[in-house]
Amino acid sequence: MSLFKDKTLMITGGTGSFGNAVLNRFLKTDIGEIRIFSRDEKKQDDMRHEFQAKMPEVAEKIKFSIGDVRDIASVKNAMHGVDYIFHAAALKQVPSCEFFPIEAVKTNVLGTENVLTAAIEAGVKNIVCLSTDKAAYPVNAMGTSKAMMEKVIVAKSRTVSPDKTKICCTRYGNVMCSRGSVIPLWIEQIRQGNPITLTDPKMTRFIMSLDEAVDLVLFAFEHGESGDILVQKAPACTIQTQAEAVCELFGGSKENIKVIGIRHGEKMYETLLTNEECANAIDMGNFYRVPCDKRGLNYDKYFNKGDAERNTLTEFNSNNTKLLTVEETKEKIASLEYIKEELAK
């Protein structure tokens, strides 16, 4: 963690699952301060008490700032002395964003613009923004707002020297057991003896753990260049496979799985990299890096000289990546701290 020694890291939307995972990873390192910026004072108070109880010797490194990314004044007030930012604040529930799309725009697009503007003015050195696979070929309001967020990031990266402020972006698949995800719901349904509800058994989703989510952000922080999009080469599984794995872990009946149909704005499979992005992607082992297109608006000079031959990869989606079996999915789910705690109850 030497890159973070004595530095101040700000996490927007920091009381969520990602913020908690970062605190668990960083608090016992040589980092100077972790600043949690969010709008919910109750969640901040809960987080404060939780970490004072379980890590009293380092909990003083956590500082809290109440505000909303929609309000640039509150963002600027929280930005003083910040070295690095992980921008996780977002509206991310697909159905609710379908019914309130302008709210998704206010938080995910305009809120990101506010964070980046304030960060550049404050001289923040490195910003990693969290996006989603739903931003690739978006069909719903949440994905569309995140796609626009990515465009804001790329546009902002062109306006500032990377020596002053580096801005890059990560795309996630489904982060298992994060707030609002389906596995905690299934566990509760099993315990109450209710049917396990799933949308479509053939639907596929990328899956990753919270630790892997943090790993991706740290990889982007260290290896990404300004304007880049970085993704993990994540495996996937069908929703049926995931539901059966949870049933086996928690004693539910596979016969009690109820198909309720696809919700507003959902797709049968998700895409982490489009065809066009794959053509430019750089293979970095467990990750792909998609460089920013640095060309300006003066296209005349490009008419006489085309691109070099491109890669011929197809898009990277949850149907053509490694599909896990029930046993492999169960093993991955069982390794999560949340699941270990639930199984111990």
Map each language-model feature to its residues.
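N-terminal Rossmann NAD(P)H-binding glycine-rich loop of SDR-like oxidoreductase domains
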Residues: 7-29
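Rossmann-fold scaffold of SDR-type NAD(P)-dependent oxidoreductases
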Residues: 12, 79-88, 129
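Conserved glycine-rich Rossmann-like NAD(P)H-binding loop of the short-chain dehydrogenase/reductase
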Residues: 30-43
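Conserved residues in the N-terminal Rossmann fold of short-chain dehydrogenase/reductase
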Residues: 38, 65-66, 106, 200, ...
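Conserved Rossmann-fold cofactor-binding substructure of NAD(P)-dependent oxidoreductases
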Residues: 60-84
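Hydrophobic/aromatic anchor residues within beta-strands of the central parallel beta-sheet
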Residues: 64, 104, 167-170
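Conserved Rossmann-fold NAD(P)-dependent oxidoreductase catalytic core, especially the SDR/UDP-sugar
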Residues: 87, 91-147, 151, 155
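Strand-loop microenvironment adjacent to phosphate/nucleotide-handling motifs in alpha/beta enzyme folds
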Residues: 115, 121, 151, 155-177, ...
